[in-house]
From Swiss-Prot:
<feature type="compositionally biased region" description="Basic residues">
    <location>
        <begin position="687"/>
        <end position="699"/>
    </location>
</feature>
<feature type="compositionally biased region" description="Acidic residues">
    <location>
        <begin position="1069"/>
        <end position="1082"/>
    </location>
</feature>
<keyword id="KW-0547">Nucleotide-binding</keyword>
<feature type="binding site">
    <location>
        <begin position="160"/>
        <end position="167"/>
    </location>
    <ligand>
        <name>ATP</name>
    </ligand>
</feature>
<dbReference type="InterPro" id="IPR001650">
    <property type="entry name" value="Helicase_C-like"/>
</dbReference>
<dbReference type="GO" id="GO:0036297">
    <property type="term" value="P:interstrand cross-link repair"/>
</dbReference>
<keyword id="KW-0067">ATP-binding</keyword>
<feature type="compositionally biased region" description="Basic and acidic residues">
    <location>
        <begin position="822"/>
        <end position="837"/>
    </location>
</feature>
<protein>
    <recommendedName>
        <fullName>ATP-dependent DNA helicase MPH1</fullName>
        <ecNumber>3.6.4.12</ecNumber>
    </recommendedName>
</protein>
<dbReference type="InterPro" id="IPR027417">
    <property type="entry name" value="P-loop_NTPase"/>
</dbReference>
<comment type="function">
    <text>ATP-dependent DNA helicase involved in DNA damage repair by homologous recombination and in genome maintenance. Capable of unwinding D-loops. Plays a role in limiting crossover recombinants during mitotic DNA double-strand break (DSB) repair. Component of a FANCM-MHF complex which promotes gene conversion at blocked replication forks, probably by reversal of the stalled fork.</text>
</comment>
<feature type="domain" description="Helicase C-terminal">
    <location>
        <begin position="490"/>
        <end position="651"/>
    </location>
</feature>
<dbReference type="GO" id="GO:0016887">
    <property type="term" value="F:ATP hydrolysis activity"/>
</dbReference>
<dbReference type="GO" id="GO:0045003">
    <property type="term" value="P:double-strand break repair via synthesis-dependent strand annealing"/>
</dbReference>
<feature type="region of interest" description="Disordered">
    <location>
        <begin position="19"/>
        <end position="55"/>
    </location>
</feature>
<dbReference type="InterPro" id="IPR044749">
    <property type="entry name" value="FANCM_DEXDc"/>
</dbReference>
<dbReference type="GO" id="GO:0009378">
    <property type="term" value="F:four-way junction helicase activity"/>
</dbReference>
Length: 1102
């Protein structure tokens, strides 16, 4: 390479050098004298050129040059006879160069490079004095030593044939950067987890890096575990996709990465994860080393250049099998090419399938879209290319119907081209399975499917072909392809020659999974001599599931241990897998890619001589293999020459200071004890971060970046004085700080409402009328409600919580913690009510024979006279109210009683309607609900008005009450204001209805037995209810005598009719049998009247 630069001076004319040394003259006269002198001294060749010196430099740009003596043309000059032009017609050498980032292909010297920015990594000055080369594996190999030395100081692309120790080179470079830096991190990335797992053993057991400082991360590892590993470990083995995710989420710090080892670097093209990782790290740091490992850099010059640009490679170390320094370490590989002819069965199937495809193939041939006579020669790529060319050309102006028809035919033929490839290169069974799936899909759609698909499967030749294939595949021992027959014979002979107990192993490579499954099935027929296992990728197919990474690792381990001796693998086994002592490689199908072919061949000949057998079909497959071999040899020469590639010296930093020159230290590296005790993979354990969660996403910023806002003036360097003065804004008012002192208590006159305001409040807001009949009361808000919310600070808008509020909240919260867990949220400490008062059984009704009813004080039940005691109903059953009906009209009575909480609150009434009997001949029934409150609130009762029967009230009056004698237990129902109204209100009241004359009074002492009237009126205990006008009547015939009501007279006996159902609301009863009481006969006399009365418990919980 240096000879090209040294010979540059020979191409420069001596006249040009002499002209550069002469000083420039001024003036026309001096110029003419100089020209005459030059002409007289010039040679015939140069005199003509000097005469044209006055013309412009571009006067003869497009004129032919003067013919000179033709020099002897060399191979280099002959290559310059062709000129490359641009799209505008200019010569490529004269066209302006694009603004690219690649430097010119020139020799780079250290002195010509700009001064390098010191690295931001913390280095160990003592360790930088030496670099270690391990001698654990035996003698030193020169090519490995040279590659490691260059890889320490340059971004290097290492291209070595398989089995020559690329992993050892990577482990040595990792070891030295591990020593040189204090807390920097090294990452080894591989395309798959099995490949990454293999590198762990080499780095830990060869380089001696502590196991506690290394880890293996994949996509299966939880993010919280990966984050913890990035914080404490220094060496990472992972897939590029996982590394990209950790970088983007902020788990990994790109500034800490000092070394990135890329395995199978030929994948670093396009949008692969390798490219994204390098770009991401380079955004934040340029001080990191890249070591790229591969066996085949690429198949084209452009592909290799993409790898160099994407990885920032500045140096290439490439070796071939013919290189002198590796010739002693390459084992011989015997390549055996077997060319086979198609079988008679294949030819018959091809003939029938060609007849079936002929109608569809002729339609695209007539349009001159796809030229070809034989339908069996179609390929997927050829059809796709022809379709694109037609759409860009004649297809743009074609009829829409024609275009849609041709596109449908193209789609069908492209799907069938894969089946043709399976038939030609893999066998009849994969071909038959593919067409069975095609036919089933078409038949399932029925008439909704493509008509061209139905036309194809309806062809007689297609049906005959499928019948023949199905019949042949049912025959035992039918191979279906000559490759299968030759494969079985070759393996049987190979294992028989190896002898029993041999440890030899074989790998069979196939491109498609269907073909690999068929090969495995056929080989396992010859057990126990041949024991085959399938090795495929993780993706699922239509017929079978993929292999997880764990299953892949287990399969490789079993193959190494000799549990089975044949491994049938797809492309997943081509790259990088160190499967072990493989002595025979069989390529079931040849690939046109030289990368894939070399990767396959590299699986053998690693530690001893190997053999490679290629099974090729005569024709196209044989030609593809020849092209792959030629392309590989050509690319190896170009890479070794290096003149066609531009290397990125600008992206390769030395990291180690230039004044530091480490010396090599060849020694035996000590392996830590922890590396030998535990042989498992260093994967993070789930128990180490139990209960932790992944942190939020972090955003890494480059060094020196300003995260704040910069004005345009500051970016242009304009001082603040030159900028326009900003208008003065009014200063913001200082926010009042919170004080610990409580504000003084205001006087009550300024806070409480006046008498007038209180009356207005009661009138407008507290007492809301309901149809101008009843009064509904709105209670004031309670400060003790919602105790759970008083233990937490509620959201605020304008006013923040004060210090005393916070102290109170903490106090309430601390008090709640002092309660038990079960009672913390129940009343009175919470809002939950667990008293279960609804589950209390309803008290039994008592039979009233007209005698006195004794009211039991609070906490006791109301007692009955011995003659009227009734047995309690069974618990758990609801009691329904007895209903009777009058002969003429329905009788309704609603009685509700409420007690208010304070003495100042006025009483309001709510109606509860029940049906009651109105006939004087029937027994009297009514229901009274009594509620007791904590304060001395007044109780209000309502009775019916005009058409309500007086009999419903008679049930509440005993003989003693009728004579003015109230029981002593009734004294609690009177107030001090009712002392003047303890007797004789019946004579004074004016009756406007049947019941308005009857009043039930409260008594604080013994009631008077006389019926005398009082001079003053008091507030009644029962308030008459206002009934709608539709139920009013002037008929008072049903009005019974007062004597009958109090039991002094006997009413006339009448026959009762069954009561009709009413829409009134009744209190339910626990005894369903009480409904039959409506049919009881009426018995004269108060002593024989039996009416069920409810015994009310006079307590707060009732």
């Amino acid at each position: 390479m240096g000879s090209d630069y040294d010979s540059f001076d020979d191409d420069v004319a001596d006249e040009v050098l002499m002209a550069l040394d002469k000083p420039a003259t001024s003036g026309l006269h001096s110029r003419e004298q100089e020209q005459q002198r030059d002409i007289s001294n010039a040679t015939p060749h140069t005199s003509t050129d000097l005469e044209l010196e006055d013309f412009g430099s571009d006067a003869f740009d497009y004129s032919p040059e003067r013919e000179r003596a033709k020099p002897i043309q060399t191979a280099r000059n002959q290559a310059r006879t062709f000129q490359q032009t641009t799209l505008l017609g200019r010569i490529a050498s004269q066209a302006p160069e694009p603004l690219g980032t690649q430097p010119r292909n020139s020799r780079v010297f250290r002195a010509d490079l700009p001064p390098e920015v010191p690295t931001h990594h913390a280095l160990d000055p003592e360790a930088l004095k030496t670099w270690v080369y391990p001698t654990n594996l035996g003698p030193i190999r020169d090519y490995q030593f040279s590659i490691v030395k260059n890889g320490l100081f340059n971004n290097t692309l290492v291209a070595l044939p398989t089995g020559l120790g690329k992993t050892f080179i990577a482990a040595t470079v990792i070891l030295n950067f591990f020593r040189w830096t204090r807390n920097a991190q090294m990452v080894f990335v591989a395309p798959t987890k099995p490949l990454a797992s293999q590198q762990v053993e080499a780095c830990l057991n060869i380089a001696g890096i502590p196991r506690s400082q290394s880890t293996l991360l994949t996509g299966e590892t939880k993010p919280v575990l990966r984050e913890a590993e990035w914080e404490g470990k220094r060496l990472f083995f992972m897939t590029p996709q996982t590394l990209m995710n950790d970088l983007s989420k902020g788990y990994a710090d790109p500034k800490r990465i000092v070394l990135l080892v890329v395995d199978e670097a030929h994948r670093a093209t396009g949008d692969y994860a390798y490219v994204k990782v390098i770009e991401f790290i380079r955004r934040f740091s340029k001080s990191f080393r890249v070591l790229a490992l591969t066996a085949t850099p690429g198949s084209t010059v452009e592909g290799v250049q993409d790898v160099i640009d994407n990885l920032g490679v500045s140096h290439v170390e490439i070796r071939t099998e013919e290189s002198i320094d590796i010739r002693n370490y390459v084992h011989s590989r015997e390549i055996d090419r077997v060319v086979l002819e198609p079988s008679d069965e294949m030819l018959r199937i091809s003939e029938l399938f060609s007849q079936a495809l002929k109608p569809l193939h002729s339609k695209i041939s007539q349009q001159k879209i796809y030229i070809g006579r034989d339908p069996m020669s179609i390929t997927t790529f050829g059809l796709l290319k022809a379709r694109q060319d037609w759409m860009k050309g004649p297809g743009r102006f074609a009829n829409q119907g024609l275009k849609m028809m041709l596109m449908a035919i193209f789609t069908i033929l492209q799907s069938l081209a894969h089946a043709i490839k399976l038939l030609n290169y893999h066998g009849i069974r994969p071909f038959y399975d593919n067409l069975v799936a095609f036919r089933s899909e078409t038949e399932d759609k029925g008439q909704k499917g493509s008509k061209y698909k139905r036309q194809l499967i309806g062809e007689q030749s297609f049906q005959e072909m499928m019948d023949l294939a199905s019949k042949w595949l049912k025959i035992d021992g039918f191979a279906g392809h000559p490759k299968l027959t030759h494969l079985c014979d070759n393996l049987l002979n190979y294992f028989m020659d190896a002898g029993e107990g041999s440890s030899t192993r074989v790998i069979v490579f196939s491109e498609y999974r269907d073909s690999a499954e068929e090969i495995t099935r056929v080989l396992n027929v010859h057990k126990p001599m041949i024991s085959a296992s399938l090795f495929v990728g993780q993706a699922d197919s239509k017929k079978s599931e993929g292999m997880k990474q764990k299953q892949q690792i287990e399969t490789i381990a079993k193959f190494r241990d000799g549990i089975f001796n044949v491994l049938v693998a797809t492309s997943i086994g081509e790259e990088g897998l160190d499967i072990g002592q493989v002595d025979l490689i069989i390529c079931y199908d040849a690939s046109s890619s030289p990368i894939r072919m070399l990767q396959r061949m590299g699986r053998t000949g690693r530690k001893r001589a190997g053999k490679i057998t290629l099974l090729l079909m005569k024709g196209k497959e044989e030609d593809n293999y020849a092209k792959a071999q030629d392309n590989y040899e050509k690319m190896q020469k170009l890479i070794c020459e290096g003149s066609r590639f531009n290397f990125r010296h600008d992206l390769s930093s030395r990291i180690v200071p230039r004044d530091v020159k480490p010396e090599v230290d060849k020694r035996m590296v000590e392996i830590p004890i922890e590396n030998t005790q535990d042989t498992s993979l260093p994967e993070p354990k789930a128990r180490s971060t139990r209960g932790k969660k992944a942190s939020k996403k972090k955003f890494n910023m480059p060094d020196g970046v300003e995260t704040g806002f910069n004005s345009v003036a500051s970016m242009l360097g304009i001082s603040a004085s030159k900028t326009k003065a900003k208008p003065n804004k009014s200063p913001k008012k200082a926010e009042s700080k919170e004080t610990d002192e409580i504000s003084p208590v205001p006087p009550l006159e300024g806070v409480l409402l006046s008498v007038k305001e209180l009356a207005e409040l009661n009138k407008k807001y507290r007492d809301l009328p309901f149809f101008h009949q009843d009064t509904e009361e709105i209670c004031m808000p309670s400060l003790t409600a919602r105790p759970d919310l008083q233990r937490v600070l509620r959201p605020t808008v304008h006013v923040k919580h004060g210090s005393y509020t916070k102290r109170c909240v903490r106090l309430f919260k601390k008090l709640s913690h002092s309660q038990g867990i079960e009672t913390r949220h129940t009343k009175p400490h919470g809002d939950t009510d667990k008293s279960r008062y609804l589950d209390i059984s309803v008290p039994p009704f008592a039979e009233d024979s007209g005698e006195d009813v004794v009211v039991v004080p609070s906490g006791r039940k109301r007692s009955l006279s011995p003659s009227s005691a009734a047995s309690p109903p069974p618990p758990g059953r609801k009691r329904k109210a007895n209903t009777t009906a009058a002969p003429r009209s329905k009788r309704q009575s609603v009685v509700d009683e409420y007690a208010s909480e304070s003495e100042d609150d006025t009483a309001a009434a709510r109606q509860r309607k029940t049906n009651a009997a109105a006939s004087p001949e029937s027994k009297r029934q009514s229901v009274l609900d009594e509620y007791a409150s904590e304060s001395d609130a007044e109780a209000v009762t309502q009775a019916s008005e005009d058409e309500e029967s007086v009999g419903s009230l008679a049930d509440f009056i005993s003989d003693g009450e009728a004579n003015g004698n109230f029981p002593k237990d009734m004294t609690g129902f009177t107030s001090d204001e009712d002392d003047d109204y303890r007797s004789g209100s019946l004579a004074k009241s004016s009756l406007s209805g049947p019941l308005s004359g009857r009043q039930v009074h409260r008594s604080s002492g013994a009631a008077s037995k006389s019926g005398s009237t009082a001079s003053t009126a008091a507030k009644p205990f029962f308030v008459p209810a206002s009934l709608p006008g539709t139920q009013q009547t002037d008929d008072d015939e049903d009005m019974p005598d007062i004597g009958i009501l109090v039991g002094k007279k006997q009413p006339e006996t009448r026959v009762r009719k069954p009561a009709k159902k009413s829409n009134a609301v009744f209190l339910s009863s626990d005894d369903d049998d009480d409904d039959n009481d409506d049919e009881d006969d009426v018995q004269p006399g108060p002593a024989k009247r039996t009416v069920r009365r409810r015994v009310i418990e006079d307590s707060e919980s009732g």
